[in-house]
Amino acid sequence: MIVRVLTATLKADQAGLFNELMRTQLPLLRHHPGLRYVKLARRIRGGEQEVCLFEEWADTASLYGWAGPDLERPRLLPGAEELVIDLRVAHYEALDMDPEPEGG
């Protein structure tokens, strides 16, 4: 499994619009084949907000199917990337593999 973490830093006055765009995108992401988990989280630090999107993918083919050929580029709705001060995407190999459910 692959864990993908998108971290975006926003000015506080842009955070509401960015969060709205991300919440609009989540249903699209949740229905993509191979996605096992997704969580959108934030923390407020002074005049900025940091947003993290945690994704867990069953395999690299599923991740590429969602993200496209350049995994370092985020897949965001139009207008979202222009709202950020800093944007990072990182990928990790999951080490704590969940057992498959019985009968499936």
PLM ranges: what are they?
Residues 21, 41, 66-69:
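Residue-level signal for well-ordered alpha-helical positions
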Residues 28-36, 56-91:
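An amphipathic, aromatic/His-enriched active-site/gating alpha helix that lines ligand/cofactor pockets
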Residues 9-21:
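Short, surface-exposed ligand-recognition loops at beta-strand->loop->(often short) alpha-helix junctions
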Residues 2-8:
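Active-site-flanking beta-strand signature of metal-NTP-handling nucleotidyl enzymes
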